[in-house]
Amino acid sequence: VFLLSEKPAASQHTRIYNNKNHYSSLVAKRTMPLTVTENVRKIVLENGLTVLTKEVHTAPVVTVQVWYKVGSRNEEPGANGIAHQLEHMMFKGTKNRPIQFGRLFSALGSDSNAFTSYDQTAYYGTVERDKLKALLVLEADRMQNSLINAEQLASEKRVVISELQGYENSPEYRLNRAVMQAAFPNHAYGLPVGGTKADVDRFQVEQVRNYYQNFYNPDNAVLVVVGDFKTANVLEIVKDVFGKLLNSQQSTVNSQRLTVNSQRLTVNRQQSIASTPIVLREPGAGQLLQVVYPLPDVNQPDVPALDVMDYILTEGRNSRLYQALVESGLANEVTAGVTSLRESGWYELLVTAAPSQKLKKIDSALSRAIANVVEKGIKAEEVKRAKTQLTADVILSNRDITSQAMQLGNDETTADDYRYTDRYLAAVSQVKEADVVAVIKKYLKKEARTVGFFEPTQKQFKEISDKPQSAQTTENFSLSTPELSSEVVKYLPPVAATDTITRVLPQQFTFANGLRVLLLPDKSTPTVTLSGYIEAGMEFDPADKAGLAAVVADNLMNGTKAKDILAIAKALEERGASLDFEAYREGVRIEGDSLAEDLPILLEILADVVRNSTFPVKELELNRQQTLTTLQLELDDPSEVAKRTFVQSIYPKKHPLHTFPTQESLEHISRKDVIDFKAKHYRPDTLVIALVGDFDLDKVRSLLQTKFGDWQVIGQPPKLKYPTVSLPEKIVHVNPVLPGKAQAITYMGYTGINRQDSRFHAALVLNQILGGDTLSSRLGAEVRDRQGLSYGIYSYFQAGKKVGTFLIEMQTSPEDTGKAIASTHQLLQQIHQQGVTAPEVETAKHTLISNYNVSLANPEELTDRILMNEVYELDTVELRSFTQKIQQVTLAQVNQAARELLHPDKIVVVTAGPAVLAEQRIK
């Protein structure tokens, strides 16, 4: 999937342990729902537009999505990436609204984006319910009236090439591209979804415009609307807004070509046997093994059994391939997935090798493990566990309305039936052991697979830095005049009066031992979301044992006094719940979720591992090797190297935040170090737990008291006081060079503010104007949209319990890096000296408030917000008063923040990736 823009991803989850105790104590035991389409209504307008609506009244928000039945599957050789290019062009304005649509979406406070995949291209936005009609009007406008001109295409082609070069930085991407082309040499499924630089360079405006007219028509689209509305009212609006649209005369010409593609695919499946592995010897860090097996299309009856097979093979620590490859020490990680599409599918396995292991040996072990399933069969409990995990994953992934709409849109465009997931879940429930063995025999044949090896030739990165320099640009890049907010207002569809939202506040409890708990019952779905925080982050790492805090967090689930690692994992996987610990600079974050009936088990495991973890030697050493491999991979990743170098350039050597793990520091960490750190920092008075979901408040409080109330420790928890850090006197450039990288990652910034700073809310408004959105901000409009220099550029105030950083992050082609940095620096100077405008402030405030309200409709984001408000020692009513504080920010306060918090001539500039020529730097 290729997004229009992308922000850093969230952490992964680890599967956790369950048992059958305590069900009746919190909720009545319920039958797991096997439908995601209840209350869905489908109509087809006279012009052929398919409309799906679903009322969900859990929060005053709605999502609008338009799915076009066109993706990379529809591309011919030489035009690879045109669907993705068109996706980008759809934000460049229409005949009626010649303005960047990102600015309109931002003004609505919409969480909007788009993506291109194999079978479809989708555009989606989630807003407060009073903005529903405005979103519908904008989507209808760009369905038929998009401006696609030569000047805009030239600029956006540079953005797309920047995006593609960013993917080229990843060895996984390069290996996958080679393997897929070999597996599907005669079908568009074998081409990269985003295209290639060579093809994108050749796109002509008429070519893209014809593609738009051909495929972007009502009879080739699905409109999905989910959220807080009345169906009859919405359908009237939809008929009025979309019913008048006409289909292009070109809209049906591609049906014959798609049939030809399908025939070619059938031939290819019998001819694309790779007898020897594809071997890539290129710059990189870790060794990789990828295997692809062809599979049937989404509507074939074997698909449910194939997904159950995948869970048995790779999901969790008890899975067959985890045991054969990771637990044995051959591999650092194994991931896999079944892809089921309109015309075909595939099963893809990706293995990251452990240090010094041979890929051929790993491949042999992989083949043996799969053959062993066929020869010896599988157990009924494995199938039962996989089916439970799979079904729970579907339910847990559909807690928010955006995800529910995504499920409907994907099913309707891929399987031609929005009810597909219901049928699929029913079929999954019927899968037996024999069915799983049968699909392995049928599809995972050694002669049918395509294999790829990635063998790295990487050398360690080297760092090029220079002395601080004076702050003048090498060229005077002229900045465009920002589009006036009056222009946004001119083209924005009418919006109804904004609703007043009254938020229910969580109940807060502090136990006698200092444990803080926040509980918010929410019966909208039969699920529970857990977030937690322990004051045991990487800031406490000893300088010579950097990485210790993360090692402790990573090993908590590896055994307790009562249960070993496999017993924990097995019991967890039986319920499809999740629990994950991840160390950050400030604190260890805990994330978990489960079906409501399994909350007692989730809390039982949480209590057991934070209180009774034993850190077995075998698992500790295996984790050390995995961590060393991960470090090796991170030092080949421009984003990770840029972040590490940026932080170490800001904070002096003796500062707690300067320390990062190295091979030497990780090798020096002993089991005693781990046990001592855990005993010192993991305490009830350093722990905060937040729960949101379907539970009885009093019973959960009682259960928490039972599990945690007798946890006693002595003394006071450790505290850190950071030394004061001065800004650099002048601009500092650092350029860590990584061989073989196509795209540069740049961080620009310095120390900033903490969450308690009185300027915090003004800083948020300032940041929204500066770089809060890659399409609508000053930086986005100038560097990305007008000049086409970056796929994505953002700014942040990272304000924590202690002073964090202000940073600007961008991705650029090496030849554009200097110009992008100089334009960014000049824009910082402009805002620092001249300030921003009153209309910009009002628009930014409205955007922040709307985004906040939309985000809290997602249970995970709501739980995290409740948790962190407590961690930052904010009043409980902050959940409700945040929007009022944003609304009260004035223009004078924002411009004062610009003068006090923007320091364009005292900035650290780190660019990781290809070498940046000295003459490109700010001087």
Regions found by a protein language model. Name each.
Residues 11, 16, 22-52, 230-254, ...:
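Proteolytic maturation boundary segments
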Residues 27-41, 137-138, 163, 182-221, ...:
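Histidine-acidic residue clusters that define the catalytic metal-binding segment
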Residues 59-72, 81-85, 99-142, 174-198, ...:
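M16 family metallopeptidases and their MPP-like homologs
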Residues 82-90, 309, 551-552, 766:
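Active-site His/Glu-centered metal-binding helix of metallohydrolases
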Residues 304-307, 326, 761-764:
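PPIase-associated folding chaperone regions across multiple families
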